[in-house]
Amino acid sequence: IHKPGDQNRNQKGDLAFNYKNIPVSVEVKSVAKNTIKQNLFGWSGKAAVKSSDKKVLTFSDGSTADVAMLPRGQFTILAVCCHAFTGSWKDFQYCLNTDLPMPNSGSLTELQKSELISVLIPVQWPPVAPFTTDLQSVLDRAIQ
């Protein structure tokens, strides 16, 4: 397990390791306290998944956009700490990068949206698909 350097453009995420000889990277975020609401099923909130600065990204069709959103595929798994919901630093939920929502910005084309991750990711406690507390199942899906 290692932490890729912040300036490493080839490997992103907060943790990187090999799982069954396949490289996996995990981006770790937490639920923003100011987004938490109690509902009939438990708790809901949002995790902010974004770049620290806006940057110009080039998309597969050659178009560009100046955004703070992260490109899809830059890490393998999103891990969200759910301390704000449960009071425990041990409670996490996990989701594959490919299952995260696209942004709904009107200034982006459909192709650009499909290649980006939404900045605010909705999460609930207890977790609702595509999130799960079962990291093993997400790791197994990641290497398929």
Cite the ranges covered by each PLM segment.
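Surface-exposed beta-strand edges and their flanking turn/coil or helix-capping segments
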Residues: 16, 38-41, 93, 107-109
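Short connector loops at helix/strand junctions that flank enzyme active sites
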Residues: 10-12, 21-23, 72-74
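Residues in well-ordered beta-strands of folded domains
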Residues: 27, 79, 93-95
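A short acidic/basic microdomain associated with nuclease active sites
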Residues: 1-18
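Active-site beta-strand-loop-beta-strand hairpin of nuclease catalytic cores
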Residues: 17-27
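Non-catalytic C-terminal interaction segments of nucleic acid-processing enzymes
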Residues: 64-65, 84-144
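Catalytic cores of nucleic-acid endonucleases
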Residues: 29-87
